[in-house]
Amino acid sequence: MNLHEYQAKQLFAEFGLPVPEGYACDTPQEAFEAAGRISTAKKVVKCQVHAGGRGKAGGVELHDTKEGVKEFAQKWLGKNLVTYQTDANGQPVTKILVEEASNIANELYLGAVVDRASRKIVFMASTEGGVEIEKVAEETPELIHKAAIDPLVGPQAYQGRELAFKLGLEGDQIKQFVKIFMGLGTMFSQYDLALLEINPLVITAEGNLLCLDGKINIDSNALYRQPKLREMHDPSQEDEREAHAAQWELNYVALDGNVGCMVNGAGLAMGTMDIVNLHGGKPANFLDVGGGATKERVAEAFKIILSDDNVKAVLVNIFGGIVRCDMIAEGIIGAVKEVGVSVPVVVRLEGTNADLGREVLANSDVDIIAAESLTDAAQKVVAAAEAK
């Protein structure tokens, strides 16, 4: 689960991290009043969406007057912001962050992720702030400095000092950086974060460190024990189909192709998408129905897939392990009848009672195309989509 910038900064402030004075606003009038409370001559106004690239898309501006801030809010609130990280529809803007402007002397990067290989939290720091860290890692990896935190021990001050030295910080800046590092390390573990970024972490003209931006991603599997963070969830930033799928414990990700995919198992789902691509098709989605491919869940999966008007055919690829293929076949038939599927459906069954499952499909009165293999299934569904 992602947080907005203003929410991330609220958490930063709780852990004693320096953040600009700012106010999250729901209306143009609130933005106008917030600008009046900020003492700096210039105010920064930012659209709050779960996507990067806001500045280049016009979602971040600098204004001298309260009226300018209000006009920005009037322009964006209730509209969608399209960036390079969103789809063509963009993300809805429901809040505007109004902040004091900062005198920036230098920009740094500070972030943290869970390293599954070492089972530790790895902090990354760089002098190349304000740009995508992926680009820095690719072009100049030597400029990224790391510190691994043992979750049983927690962040250590010496690790923060080492990073500060490598960033070229001096004097009181080192103390400030260590405080930020220690706070973030504690926050990361306490709130079950999966990713944390401050980009940029700036050095102001006065020589102080300031968290100018914030990005937080929380491990969704840990939300059951993070009630405070659950309340920060913004459903407006999610694809409607993905949100509906989550209610049925279906893992769904919308894509831009025309072949709907319904599979049990994330690895098999990715393999299915690959082979559809290999045979000239374009997947319309990733959908993992999991181990419980019941009639009800399959029916909901069909509804979600077919809510995308671009879908011209559906490939159902099921491996029967604990669940028998004949039972799955009956569930598919029932779901197709219930939903009233109007596009070609190709089904490939493999595993326990696979032959019996294919026989059940063949003897049904539902128009389902049975496939003998994964390659056969991909070829048939691509051909069906092209003919539609």
Curated annotation (Swiss-Prot):
One of its GO terms (molecular function) is magnesium ion binding. ATP binds at residues 46, 53-55, 99, 102, 107. It is an enzyme of class 6 (ligase). Residues 9-244 form the ATP-grasp domain. Its EC number is 6.2.1.5. InterPro entries: ATP-grasp (IPR011761), ATP-grasp_succ-CoA_synth-type (IPR013650), ATP_grasp_subdomain_1 (IPR013815), Succ-CoA_synthase_bsu_CS (IPR017866), SUCC_ACL_C (IPR005811), Succ_CoA_ligase-like_bsu (IPR005809), Succinyl-CoA_synth-like (IPR016102). Signal peptide: none annotated. GO terms for biological process: succinyl-CoA metabolic process; tricarboxylic acid cycle. Pathway: Carbohydrate metabolism; tricarboxylic acid cycle; succinate from succinyl-CoA (ligase route): step 1/1. Succinyl-CoA synthetase functions in the citric acid cycle (TCA), coupling the hydrolysis of succinyl-CoA to the synthesis of either ATP or GTP and thus represents the only step of substrate-level phosphorylation in the TCA. The beta subunit provides nucleotide specificity of the enzyme and binds the substrate succinate, while the binding sites for coenzyme A and phosphate are found in the alpha subunit. Heterotetramer of two alpha and two beta subunits. This is Succinate--CoA ligase [ADP-forming] subunit beta. It comes from Vibrio parahaemolyticus serotype O3:K6 (strain RIMD 2210633). The lineage of its organism: Bacteria, Pseudomonadati, Pseudomonadota, Gammaproteobacteria, Vibrionales.
